[in-house]
């Protein structure tokens, strides 16, 4: 009647339009029921043939194809292109259907996009529903009935889904077997191809890449990214595989992480097994089959391990030769690179640092921390090396401890031997080759003067203290900057030997430095008989700890009947407090006296050996008196 700018071509085309504008109808019966709907395009036999608005409405519907949108009544803003495209839609809006038979069952579903022959063909909402489904490709989402918010792109992608929601499938035949699984993401040719949940299940699977997760059936919570990543998993759960062929042999295991090309490639466990392996890096953990609880990070790290457990590996080529060794820790490039146990073994080896423990083959229970530490060890056991190059030449020796850069750096036993050397401090024992049972503590300990090389059972304690010969035995040197006096001796000093004690069990006296060339202001002492006569020698027993004054915290222990010092027998000696009083009353002794001293906690102490000069002086005085008396007696006779 009053409609304007309508183009109507074909028998009965737009024959009911009254006051509607800007419509195009081309084809027999197209737009034939419309009265007041405007701005529609209907091209094809009976296209939009039932559209009809009882009030003036801008429909913005477009239907192109035989019977396209033929059932639309009051739906708006639909784009329907293709024979039978959305031909049953009635009061639905904002749909796009392009391709033969697309969206051809739905009646009241809105906001769907179906592009490709038979895409979303079976979708059908009988109540008004915003489906928000997107299907692009031949048969994409072809079986979806009432599922919502699915995005399916690719030929036959998601084509078996029915009442499933929130899935994303991109790639030919991706997610194409599942019916009721929701919240899956499959990107790539046949990604998640076999997944199929027959009851409503939130799978939370993600597969991205050619045939990624292609065999997953009912496994859930898997993240598989990369060509053929996790492609054998069927019922496995909560796995992460990122990289070409990552975790590609796994079937039923759960909770593994494989990141990197071929990481954990051959791992395979039956349903319900929790291997909890982590492989990160090119070929990381490549050969693991049934090993569990391994953490492997780095290119080729742990790539020969098979049925080994509880290993920690960080670094390129770290632990890269071992097959059956378990409970190793290798952190650093090439750490424990050549370790290899061909039978199941708990190695308990720890190597941290560049090339640390590089050459270990079958040695066990070694702790090697520091670049190049213990890097020549092969089958040595129970060694500890901490510091750059520590124990760096040893091959087969056992039970050495080297702490500090270059400590025991040239020690090397070519046969199995308990070396039992301990070196702590920068370069301590750095010259020892085959010496055993030495203890060297302090920077450069064992290197002063003549280097200790093949000696045994020596103790050097202090900076730059040493022994008297390369093959020294049973020498003790404590102090700094000097060498011990000889075998079976203990020497103490700072810069030179101040005291040497024999250690061979014979009646050997203490020897202290007394060279006149070291002394000045020499004078004859007058401290003698008078001082000695004022001393009171006593006998005594040590108190039990409970009886000591409680403020003497080094010795007091409530309720303890243990003697505070020594045994409970009678001893001979002095009381320090009385000796201090005598010293203070003798000016000839008071200056320079080192007989009496006081500990920081207030405990008074005596150095009994320092009475000797006074005793000698007293004897000299008595001897002089005796000589005088004998001379007098002789004159009287």
Task: Give each language-model segment a name.
Residues 1-512:
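Glycine- and small/polar-enriched repetitive beta-structure motifs of secreted/surface proteins
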């Amino acid at each position: 009647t009053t409609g304007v700018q309508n183009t109507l071509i074909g028998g009965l085309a737009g024959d009911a339009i009254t006051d509607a504008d800007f419509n195009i109808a081309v084809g027999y019966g197209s737009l034939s029921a419309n009265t007041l709907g405007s701005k529609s395009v209907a091209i094809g036999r009976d296209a939009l043939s039932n559209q009809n608005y009882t009030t003036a409405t801008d429909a913005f519907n477009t239907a192109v194809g035989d019977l396209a949108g033929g059932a639309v009544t009051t739906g708006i803003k639909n784009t329907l292109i293709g024979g039978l495209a959305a031909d049953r839609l009635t009061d639905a809006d904002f749909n796009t259907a392009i391709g033969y038979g697309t969206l051809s069952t739905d009646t009241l579903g809105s906001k769907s996009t179906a592009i490709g022959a038979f895409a979303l063909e079976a979708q059908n909402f009988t109540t008004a529903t915003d489906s928000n489904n997107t299907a692009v490709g031949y048969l994409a989402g072809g079986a979806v009935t009432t599922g919502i918010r699915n995005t399916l792109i690719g030929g036959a992608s998601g084509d078996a889904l029915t009442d499933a929601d929130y899935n994303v499938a991109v790639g030919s035949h991706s997610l194409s077997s599942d019916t009721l699984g929701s919240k899956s993401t499959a990107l790539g040719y046949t990604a998640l191809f076999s997944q199929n949940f027959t009851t409503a299940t939130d799978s939370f699977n993600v597969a991205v890449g050619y045939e990624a997760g292609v065999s997953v059936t009912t496994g859930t919570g898997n993240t598989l990214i990369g060509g053929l990543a996790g492609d054998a998993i069927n019922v496995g759960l909560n796995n992460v595989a990122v990289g070409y062929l990552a975790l590609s042999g796994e079937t039923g295991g759960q909770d593994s992480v494989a990141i990197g090309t071929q990481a954990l490639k051959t791992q395979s466990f039956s349903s319900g097994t929790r291997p909890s392996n982590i492989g990160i890096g090119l070929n990381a953990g490549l050969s693991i089959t049934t090993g569990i609880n391994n953490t492997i990070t780095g290119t080729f790290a742990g790539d020969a391990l098979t049925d080994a457990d509880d290993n920690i590996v960080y670094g390129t080529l770290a632990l890269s030769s071992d097959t059956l060794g378990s409970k190793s820790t290798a952190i650093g490039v090439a750490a424990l690179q050549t370790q290899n146990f061909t039978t199941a073994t708990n190695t308990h080896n720890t190597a941290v640092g560049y090339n640390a423990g590089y050459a270990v083959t079958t040695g066990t229970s070694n702790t090697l921390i520091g670049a190049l530490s213990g890097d020549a060890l092969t089958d040595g056991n129970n060694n500890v090396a901490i510091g750059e190059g520590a124990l760096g030449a040893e091959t087969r020796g056992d039970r050495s401890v080297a702490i500090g850069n270059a400590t025991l750096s040239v020690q090397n036993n070519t046969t199995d031997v308990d070396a039992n050397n301990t070196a702590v401090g920068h370069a301590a024992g750095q010259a020892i080759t085959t010496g055993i049972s030495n203890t060297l503590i302090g920077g450069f300990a064992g290197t002063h003067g003549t280097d200790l090389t093949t000696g045994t059972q020596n103790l050097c304690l202090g900076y730059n203290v040493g022994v008297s010969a390369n093959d020294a035995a049973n020498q003790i040197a404590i102090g700094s900057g000097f060498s011990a006096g000889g075998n079976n001796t203990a020497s103490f000093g700072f810069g030179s030997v101040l005291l040497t004690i024999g250690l061979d069990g014979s009646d050997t006296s203490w020897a202290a430095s007394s060279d006149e060339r070291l002394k000045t202001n020499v004078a004859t002492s007058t401290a003698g008989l008078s001082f000695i006569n004022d001393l009171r020698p006593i006998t005594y027993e040590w108190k039990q700890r409970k009886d000591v004054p409680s403020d003497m915290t080094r010795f007091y222990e409530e309720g303890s009947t243990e003697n505070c010092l020594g045994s409970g027998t009678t001893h001979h000696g002095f009381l320090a407090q009385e000796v201090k009083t005598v010293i203070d009353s003798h000016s000839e002794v008071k200056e320079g006296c080192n007989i009496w001293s006081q500990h920081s906690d207030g405990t008074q102490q005596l150095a009994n050996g320092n009475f000797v000069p006074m005793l000698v002086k007293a004897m000299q005085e008595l001897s002089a008196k005796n000589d005088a008396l004998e001379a007098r007696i002789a004159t009287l006779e």
